[in-house]
């Protein structure tokens, strides 16, 4: 994956509140997991437009790549963008995916289609396989 962490600021232009938390998370990820292709914080237009991002912020670690994974700063902004994309018909839903819990858990939306449920079931099965392998180690 090529991951962008989005915010309302770009690469430290606002150094307080949620942009600062995103910026600090990126710093930790770059230090501890340098193999992960991730950068931010950045506004959505810079995340989605690699030419604009590369021209404006040539130091970015996503240079020349198209983002295929977006991490939002909070549930409210993530859910709003997710619902907007679904209503506009520009994305297929896979999720929501809960992470960081001791056991896999997944929720379906009241408006989920059969395809949405099949996709989420696939994620749940993969979660179970990964967890089983971890438990055997």
Task: Kindly give the residue locations of the regions a language model identified.
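Short coil/turn connectors at secondary-structure junctions
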Residues: 1, 33-35, 65-68, 93-94, ...
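Flexible, glycine/charged-enriched surface loops at secondary-structure junctions
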Residues: 1-4, 33-42, 131-137
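Catalytic cores of large soluble enzymes that bind and process phosphate-bearing ligands
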Residues: 14-21, 73, 109-116
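Short glycine-rich anion-binding loops that position phosphate/pyrophosphate groups of nucleotides
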Residues: 11, 75-78
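Internal helix-turn-beta structural module
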Residues: 60-62, 77, 82-137
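Active-site rim loops that border cofactor/substrate pockets in soluble metabolic enzymes
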Residues: 8-69
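Short, well-ordered beta-strand segments
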Residues: 4-6, 106
